[in-house]
Amino acid sequence: MARPSRILTLIVSALIFNALHAQDTLFARQTICTLASPAMYGRGMQHRGDSIAADFLRKELAAYGLKPLAKNYFQYFRFPRTTTRPPIVQAGYRSQNVCAYLPGKSDSMIVFTAHYEHLGMHGDTIFYGAHDNASGTAAVLDLARALSTQKRHYTYVFLFFGGEEAGLVGSSFFSDIPLIKLDKVKLLVNLDLFCGGDEGLMVVNAHDERTSPYVDLLESINDEHRFAAKIARRKNAPNSDHYPFTSLCPAVFIYTLGGRYGGYHSPLDRCEDCGLEHYSNFNTLLHTFLNRLEK
């Protein structure tokens, strides 16, 4: 029979674990609801919603003590062409990537990315973009927040891209004019579409010889702990901000499979419809993965 002290320790540990998970999910929910609120105007060009969102991210990163990769954390770029459907953007419109880092003992880097902008507005209709991609942005911001309190071997870089919906504009600009040495990147992980997840996680560009060992590690961790229903793999595709980097460094894109989220690329992609039932498990999976890489 287990001793009472042992039972008490297990109970306390379980309570602490559950409390930490609840805090992670609460942070993600609050961040998603902030980014997908009417005050952000769909994070597009209209009313400069993208700049309002970028300023929110800049303030959060500064509060966590992350260092800027560019002045005021912003790398500015301009859109090359006018679009006629959401996201409605005028050629020459200036937007920004939000770029920060946590220095480690090594100059070898692990990079997390997410696109923070969305489709903006069409007439008076707001495209809120909770799933796409306030959710991935919140997950990357949560990682930055947690890692800022820890001493790490690797340098961690956090990039929040603009212009993804108009054709990977911000990430392509960064890959062309990088603020870091891309040959020092050990792995780049892009998070996009991170609500739901009843059916697990998909890893894009998982079959590349440079990325497959990392996906193997992620899968083995999940086999041990069952953080996700499954880890699925697919070949590379130009469907998110990892793509401009795939010829320059090991880069993958992770998104959720199944579960609850609002309408894709519609005004119904709202905060209240973003299911976060699996968020804490996915967050713990990523932290466990990083801890294994650090060994």
Where are these regions (language model features)?
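Second-shell loop/turn segments in exported
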Residues: 38-48, 86-89, 124-133, 160-161, ...
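Active-site-adjacent substrate-binding region
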Residues: 199-295
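Extracytoplasmic/secreted proteins, especially bacterial periplasmic and envelope-associated proteins
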Residues: 27-34, 48-63, 72, 135-142, ...
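A non-catalytic alpha/beta surface segment that caps or lines the substrate-entry region
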Residues: 43-101
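Bacterial Sec-dependent N-terminal signal peptides
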Residues: 1-25
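Acidic/histidine-rich catalytic neighborhood of metal-dependent amide-processing enzymes
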Residues: 94-96, 120-213, 217, 238
